């Protein structure tokens, strides 16, 4: 039997998992590159203690949990319907269900060929590598032997980009695109990670070029900005707040280019935090497009990606 495993970072399923999510994320050596395990655990613990109260408050505003799992389950259901002969499941990096649980499912169903699809459109050591590494290490640890396939990215996939275009058009609901500046908001990374050879920035920039070539001159202008910065180190620029300041007085549509599924970074940061900033500084109109989520076109893209693996 064959199986598709959708990999993602995960998100708290309830408020009690907020601390677990933060602790696991900051203890990831791909996120916090401290070689000494004990030191990294200590630093992760300290960061978690400093951030958990605010993070918990943010998730309370989202109904007490991350929306990521909801959208993932809906996506799996539609993908499973499209591929009835393939077992479709998920494995999250920082919250349940973890890779170990997914592997137990695969072993129970006697799956001998596994297609791992990290739901990150652009490759990064902090996301794609981390999720794949975690899954393979867990499979090796429990003695699970199968034929494995995986992908590094899929931002060039034609159907995936059609899914994005559909979301952008849907967000404007018939309004004149020429009146809007389209801002692609990408999850930021520390500059040091890029300088060490991580291809994330290059792939995001290439993706923006692909999308703008499809959209041609429909919008007044196209921009790339970065969100979700954390800590005092130098991060990718410009920040989304800086870009909003630059474009204040104009109509702005934001598309979260780093994400395939809506999560706290879209539904809290973009829809709530940055919306408040936009209103405060005088942005004429501020809109955020939804991620592809479980759209039919994104399901088409995943089927296409699977069939090409």
From Swiss-Prot:
It is found in: Cytoplasm. It is an enzyme of class 4 (lyase). It holds the Pfam family Ferrochelatase. Its EC number is 4.98.1.1. Pathway: Porphyrin-containing compound metabolism; protoheme biosynthesis; protoheme from protoporphyrin-IX: step 1/1. It catalyses: heme b + 2 H(+) = protoporphyrin IX + Fe(2+). Keywords: Cytoplasm, Heme biosynthesis, Iron, Lyase, Metal-binding, Porphyrin biosynthesis. Fe cation binds at residues 187, 265. Catalyzes the ferrous insertion into protoporphyrin IX. HAMAP family: Ferrochelatase (MF_00323). This is Ferrochelatase. It comes from Nitratiruptor sp. (strain SB155-2).
